[in-house]
Amino acid sequence: MKIVVYSKPNCPWCVKVKELMNRLHLSYDEKILDVDYTRDELRELVGEHLPLTVPQVFINDRRIGGYEEFADWCDNHGYGNE
C-alpha cells in the first residue's frame, strides 16, 4: 500500500494525521508545500471544486481526504484509529 501525505509546515492537522499513521505503523511518504509541491499542483490532484486544505492523504493514488476522512478510512479498513 502506497500512502502519500501532502502537508505544510506548522499545520496541526498534518501533525495529527502523521501521528495517527505512526501509531498504526503505516508507512507513508510526505510531500511538503513549497518544497515538494506547489498549491497549483495540489489543486490539480484534489480537483478545482474542492477547498484546498492540508493534509491531503492519497492511498494507491486515490484521494482519501484530510484527517477525518483518513481516520474514517482506517476504521472502515480494519486499522482502527486508537
Where are these predicted regions, by residue range?
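Thioredoxin-like thiol-disulfide oxidoreductase module
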Residues: L33-P51
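Alpha-helical elements of the RecA-like P-loop NTPase motor core of helicases
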Residues: V15, D40, D72
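Local sequence-structure signature of Cys/Sec-based thiol-disulfide redox active-site neighborhoods
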Residues: M1-K31
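Non-catalytic, surface beta->alpha helical segment in thiol-disulfide oxidoreductase systems
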Residues: I59-E82
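Structural micro-motif
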Residues: G47-F58, Y67-E68
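Short alpha-helical
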Residues: P12, Y37, G65
